[in-house]
């Protein structure tokens, strides 16, 4: 299949440290090439890819210190990519776009008129940095009109349900993210005596709760993550809730880490703490940890119930007290079983195969109708709490 991916222009592909969407795109593209597809990637020149690459910027925007608010820069990349596709539409079977920030919404009117079949993966929580109750007015209705014509892929059952309660989004399927298992060493039989927290240092990611749990459990905790210096609320959170707790002994902050460094930490850690305070659409760090054989203790929010079979490959908890209790039981988890759950359900191979299925569905839809219309989900809507449980038992 001849596949075109338009990536967001903000972060390099793959990312050097933080960048969940970009890491997923990089993994998917490489696996699709390995499976014999002809892949073209529209991304800045600093991408490292085996795909045919078409670039309109020499470097990703963040590498040039361009802030999120500079939407016109992103629009230029998206517009030029779509212009190229209009001129070479006969060279492609499917267009796959990736929605991860408000700037990416320029894609809606740009791609809706393309004769090329397409799908868009919603990587974040719509409408991103917009407040849902303020999603109104002529401009918003304009984008929503176009959005209703684009077939969307959700990254979890929870994300699909959560978004459709707010907006008439046109989800045609759910495809879970996957990881390249070659990037992860076999599970350790003797992990070191520390717990790990990885992510963006924002309130909703819950680093302060991981610290509280580690203090109460009396165990060492390593914090690894990126601190956005350009957002005052994030700076205040770090200065007031995180920095005073860092002592270099029990609580250590090591800053952002590369994917290789992160995977090594996950391989060595007793467990990953993930006390999220928002309805996270997926949670890449959980499957990255599990690919390394590292069990995850996560708050029962977002898609966590679809990933973690509690008591078998990790623990789902409701508060810090339950997290502390689970930390004391972490060594009862079989790290080999943790890894196996990723091999059988969250690998790059499975992700790419599932997208091939979705592409074929989108191509059929394009042939049969002028506008995309919502379809009933293909899979049985088993409750999310049973999804991870069923996978472990298979």
How does the language model describe each region?
Residues 1-394:
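Catalytic cores of nucleotide-sugar-dependent glycosyltransferases that transfer UDP/GDP/TDP-activated
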């Amino acid at each position: 299949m001849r596949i075109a991916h338009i990536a967001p222009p903000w972060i390099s592909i793959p990312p050097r440290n933080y960048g969940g969407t970009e890491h997923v795109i990089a993994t998917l593209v490489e696996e699709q090439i390995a499976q014999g597809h002809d892949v073209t990637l529209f991304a800045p020149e600093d991408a490292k890819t085996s795909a045919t690459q078409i670039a309109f910027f020499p470097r990703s925007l963040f590498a040039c210190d361009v802030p999120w608010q500079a939407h016109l820069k992103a629009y230029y990349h998206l517009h030029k990519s779509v212009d190229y596709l209009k001129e070479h539409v006969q060279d492609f079977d499917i267009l796959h776009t990736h929605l991860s920030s408000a700037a990416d919404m320029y894609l809606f009117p740009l791609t809706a008129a393309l004769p090329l079949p397409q799908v868009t993966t919603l990587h974040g929580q719509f409408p991103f940095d917009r407040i849902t109750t303020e999603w109104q007015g002529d401009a918003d209705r304009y984008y929503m009109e176009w959005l209703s014509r684009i077939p969307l892929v959700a990254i979890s059952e929870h994300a699909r349900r959560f978004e459709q309660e707010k907006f008439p989004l046109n989800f045609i399927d759910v495809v879970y993210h996957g990881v390249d298992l070659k990037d992860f060493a076999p599970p350790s039989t003797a992990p070191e005596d520390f717990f790990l927290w990885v992510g963006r240092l924002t309130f909703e990611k819950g680093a302060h709760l991981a610290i509280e749990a580690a203090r109460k459990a009396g165990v060492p905790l390593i914090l690894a993550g990126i601190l956005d210096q350009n957002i005052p609320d994030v700076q205040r959170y770090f200065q007031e809730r995180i920095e005073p707790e860092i002592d270099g002994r029990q609580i250590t902050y090591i800053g952002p880490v590369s994917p290789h460094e992160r995977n090594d930490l996950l391989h060595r850690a007793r467990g990953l703490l993930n006390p999220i305070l928002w309805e996270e659409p997926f949670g890449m760090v959980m499957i990255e940890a599990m690919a390394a054989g590292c069990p995850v203790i996560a708050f029962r929010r977002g898609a966590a119930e679809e990933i973690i079979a509690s008591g078998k490959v990790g623990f789902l908890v409701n508060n810090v007290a339950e997290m502390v209790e689970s930390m004391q039981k972490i060594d009862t988890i079989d790290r080999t079983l943790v890894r196996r759950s990723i091999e059988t359900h969250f690998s790059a191979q499975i992700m790419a195969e599932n997208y091939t299925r979705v592409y074929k569905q989108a191509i059929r839809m394009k042939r049969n109708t002028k506008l995309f219309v919502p379809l009933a989900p293909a899979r049985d809507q088993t409750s999310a709490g049973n999804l991870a449980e069923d996978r472990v038992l298979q």
